Amino acid sequence: MDIRLELLKSEDEEQFIRDNQAAFNYGAEQYFTDEELKEQYEEEGQIISRETIVSSIHRKGSIAYRIIEGDKKVGGIIINLKNTFGDLEIFFVVPNSESKGVGQAAWREVEKLHPEIKVWETVTPYFEKRNIHFYVNKLGFHIIGFYNEFNKDIQIPEEMDGMFRFQKKTGQ
C-alpha cells in the first residue's frame, strides 16, 4: 500500500472540508436513527461543522495533511504541535477507503514526520466504536478520560460531553 501525506493546499481546502464532513457523517449514520442523528449535528446536516474544520486548519501551530493512496485523496489529518506535545485534532478516511490499513499507514507517517512529539492526544465520541478500537488496538493510544454527565469539570467544554480522551506516549 502506497500511503503518503501531503500538506493541504489552499485550492484543496474546500474538498478537504467536504470529504471530512462526509466521513464523519458516514460514521455517525452507522449508529443513529435519522431522528437521533439530528441531535448530534454541529450544524444543519453535518456531524462536524465547516467552522470546526476551518478553525482547526488555520489554528496557530496546526498542520493539515491530505492522505494520499497512489494518486487518490483518501483522507485527511489535522494536528496541532507545541514543543513535544501533539494534538490530533481531526483524522478521517473517506468511507470507501476505510478498513484497509490506510489510517494505520497514515499515522505511521505522522509519527515519522514528527519524531519530536513525545505525547499525542485526541478525542472521539462514545458512539464511534470503530475509532475507539482503532486508537487503542491499532495505534497504541490509551483512554485517559471519558467526559459525560458524571464527569463534569468547568475546564471541560460542554461539547466534550460523551467524548473519550486518548493519549499516546512515544518516548521520554
Label every PLM stretch briefly:
Residues 81-89, 98, 116:
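A conserved beta-turn-beta hairpin within the catalytic core of GNAT-like acetyltransferases
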Residues 64-66, 72-80, 87-92:
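Conserved beta-strand in the GNAT
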Residues 113-126:
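Conserved GNAT acetyl-CoA-binding A-motif
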Residues 4-31:
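A short beta-loop-alpha structural element at the N-terminal edge
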Residues 123-127, 132, 136-163:
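Conserved catalytic-core motifs of GNAT/GCN5-like acyltransferases
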Residues 93, 99-112, 137:
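Conserved acetyl-CoA-binding loop-helix of GNAT-fold acetyltransferases
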Residues 8, 91-93, 124:
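Hydrophobic adenine-recognition pocket in adenosine-nucleotide-binding enzymes
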Residues 24-53, 62:
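Conserved GNAT-fold acetyl-CoA-binding loop/helix
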